[in-house]
Design a protein with these regions (language model features):
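The feature captures two recurrent sequence modes
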Residues: 1-58, 207-211
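Short, flexible helical or helix-coil boundary motifs
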Residues: 8, 48, 168, 172, ...
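Intrinsically disordered, low-complexity regions
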Residues: 22-23, 86, 198
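Acidic, carboxylate-rich catalytic segments that either coordinate divalent cations
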Residues: 176-211
Length: 211
């Protein structure tokens, strides 16, 4: 925050990457040593295709159309995202972000992403504030923290963001903390949301105009 206030945007990006990336990389090293680190870096340099992993995700297309798994499949394909294991796909350790998109119902445009960042901040039990910080800085202050999306300004709607934060906090599990989602993928999406305690996405309110 001090770096942002001083308009040291490069240092702010470095600090953010060190805080989030360092934690994720540390977990990969502790759990899988060099293999875990390789899995994290391979997609960044567009190498390391894992056909078995990719095939497992591609098979979600055969699930019922009302299922959690089919919704995840559609989320990837409709946005032209590569699955984990496909060339250019993100590491599986990061899939909790896309699982959150599906469960929350937030889109991948800037308005949806800042709400998804708040939803994520709610369900992440360890340092979740950093995801809210990311969303506000990336999609409201116009400081680019990730190479995946361009920066935007003016997307902080306090009502939407606080609602998203509350919805994430209501989730019974931390999707980022070794959550085994595979047994839930064949189930209806609405049932999964209910079991996890994710409140329904309220439609945007329309101001009442006096006659």
């Amino acid at each position: 925050l001090r770096e942002l206030a001083a308009r040291h945007h490069l240092m702010a990006r470095i600090d953010f990457t060190r805080r989030i990336g360092g934690r994720v990389m540390g977990e990969a090293w502790r759990e899988e040593r060099w293999n875990g680190v390789r899995k994290m870096f391979a997609p960044v340099i567009s190498v390391g295709e894992d056909r078995a992993t990719a095939t497992r995700y591609q098979a979600l297309a055969r699930l019922p159309q009302d299922s959690f798994g089919f919704a995840l499949y559609e989320h990837y394909r409709s946005n032209d995202f590569a699955f984990p294991g496909e060339p250019g796909g993100l590491p599986e350790r990061g899939i909790f972000h896309d699982l959150g998109h599906v469960l929350s119902g937030y889109a991948t445009d800037p308005d949806g992403e800042i709400q998804q960042a708040a939803f994520q901040a709610g369900f992440v039990r360890n340092d979740g504030f950093m995801f809210l910080y990311f969303g506000i800085v990336q999609f409201h202050l116009g400081v680019r923290l990730t190479p995946i999306a361009k920066s935007e300004t003016g997307y902080l709607d306090v009502d939407k963001v606080t609602s998203a934060l509350a919805r994430g906090a209501a989730c019974k599990v931390d999707l980022s903390d070794h959550w085994d989602f595979w047994p839930l993928l064949p189930l209806p999406l609405e049932r999964v949301r209910e079991e996890l305690g994710v409140p329904p996405l309220e439609p945007p309110s329309v101001p009442h105009l006096a006659a």
